[in-house]
Swiss-Prot record:
Name of the protein in its database record: UDP-N-acetylglucosamine 1-carboxyvinyltransferase
GO cellular component terms, semicolon-separated: cytoplasm
Modified residues (2-(S-cysteinyl)pyruvic acid O-phosphothioketal): C116
Active site feature: C116 (proton donor)
Phylogenetic classification of the source organism: Bacteria, Pseudomonadati, Pseudomonadota, Gammaproteobacteria, Enterobacterales
Binding, phosphoenolpyruvate: K22, N23
Length: 420
């Protein structure tokens, strides 16, 4: 397995161009199964999870071509309706194939999924949502099997809890249902809005995305179209933190500041000077150490759980003590023991971590456990004394496009060491 070797004590400064959002590109690629005509998706990042999705869609009979940042999807001749275990096991997002398959073809089956090792992320909300739209669901031999006679039927669905994944599944399936569907307590993330905008480009009638009440008027078919995936707010936040923890200055280009309000507020609280334009953000630490901050993760527009690991690192090298409470996923502090091996001082109590800032971390051999945790370990290596080796970086390749190239452009001394 590949590793990163990072030489530390670097002030990270410069410009970085932000890639398309993984968390929008994935649901949009799966939603393209609903289209009877070809679709062109622009600004699609080159990531492991995207490659897996393309393989899966191809296996279902979709014609797919990649050309730089664009992906051309033609699902007009889909003739397979099963997403098999060997592709699904590495990626939880595969469950998003189920809604479009049953909505358009009346049948679909997906192996129960894999992905990051972050606590329990059950698929039950996806299943109950599809059942409320009239699908019959069976769990057999490790597969979720969905079927319906005729079309799905619109329904009034109140979600038990806010779930990005289940909101995408229900919204996608409801686009081709008969009648109107209302989703109450829907997730409000920018990636949900992007998926809805994509579907509307193809002829869907979705309103209210970005609020907790989404209305979908069913249509009989979706056509083709061209759509540009929104920029990755989590990648943007990660590079802003890189400058914040190293006393540096960074400008993130081709991003969307309006998707990062909670993150920018906390960076300002930590002492960063921040300016924003329509599609750029600049952060200047002016050589200062950040101040520790206290926050809790929450569904959008609250503080994103996908930025929690990076801000844990910020707190661990900040002045003072900060408390972080994780309310979205259990078991999402697996990076903290690794950072403690680098000299950080922290206590974990249930879903809370208390971070006591230290002036300097020391390089060590550490292991990535999930996507965002691995990013925090790489950033820690950039500022630690000495050399840090980050193992199991396949996690990072699932969600960051060419992270080592982008960090090098900011002055990081990082190299990929090929594994056996």
């Amino acid at each position: 397995m590949d590793k990163f070797r990072v030489q530390g004590r670097t002030r990270l400064s410069g410009e970085v161009t932000i890639s398309g959002a993984k968390n929008a590109a994935l649901p949009i690629l799966f939603a393209a199964l609903l289209a009877e005509e070809p679709v062109e998706l622009q600004n699609v990042p080159k990531l492991k999870d995207i490659d897996t999705t393309i393989k899966l869609l191809s296996q279902l009979g979709t014609k797919i071509e990649r050309n730089n940042g664009s992906v051309f999807v033609d699902a007009s001749a889909v003739n397979e309706f099963c997403a098999p275990y060997d592709l699904v096991k590495t990626m939880r997002a595969s469950i998003w194939a189920l809604g479009p398959l049953v909505a358009r073809f009346g049948q679909g089956q997906v192996s129960l999924p894999g992905g990051c090792a972050i606590g329990a992320r059950p698929v039950d909300l996806h299943i109950t949502g599809l059942e409320q739209l009239g699908a019959e669901i069976k769990l057999e031999e490790g597969y979720v099997k969905a079927s319906v006679n005729g079309r799905l039927k619109g329904a009034h669905i109140v979600m038990d809890k806010v779930s990005v994944g289940a909101t995408v599944t229900i919204m996608s399936a409801a686009t081709l249902a008969e009648g109107t569907t209302v989703i109450e307590n829907a997730a409000r993330e920018p990636e949900i809005v992007d998926t809805a905008n994509f579907l509307n480009t193809l002829g869907a009638k979705i309103s209210g995305a970005g609020t907790d009440r989404i209305t979908i008027e069913g249509v009989t078919r979706l056509g083709g179209g061209v759509y540009r995936v929104l920029p990755d707010r989590i990648e943007t936040g990660t590079f802003l933190v890189a400058a914040a923890i190293s006393g540096g200055k960074v400008v993130c280009r081709q991003t969307r500041p309006d998707t990062l309000d909670a993150v920018l507020a906390k960076l300002r609280e930590a002492g960063a000077d921040i300016e924003v334009g329509d599609d750029w953000i600049s952060l200047d630490m002016q050589g200062k150490r950040p101040k520790a901050i206290t926050f809790r993760t929450a569904p959008h527009p609250g503080f994103p759980t996908d930025m929690q690991a990076q801000f844990s690192l910020l707190n661990l090298v900040a002045e003072g003590t900060g408390v972080i409470t994780e309310t979205i996923f259990e078991n999402r502090f697996m990076h903290v023991p690794e950072l403690i091996r680098m000299g950080a001082h922290a206590e974990i109590e249930s879903n809370t971590v208390i971070c006591y800032g230290v002036e300097q971390l020391s390089g060590a051999q550490v292991m990535a456990t999930d996507l965002r945790a691995s990013a925090s370990l790489v950033l820690a290596g950039c500022i630690a004394e000495g050399v840090t080796i980050v193992d199991r970086i396949y996690h990072i390749d699932r969600g960051y496009e060419r992270i080592e190239d982008k960090l090098r452009a900011l002055g990081a001394k990082i190299e990929r060491v090929k594994g056996e």
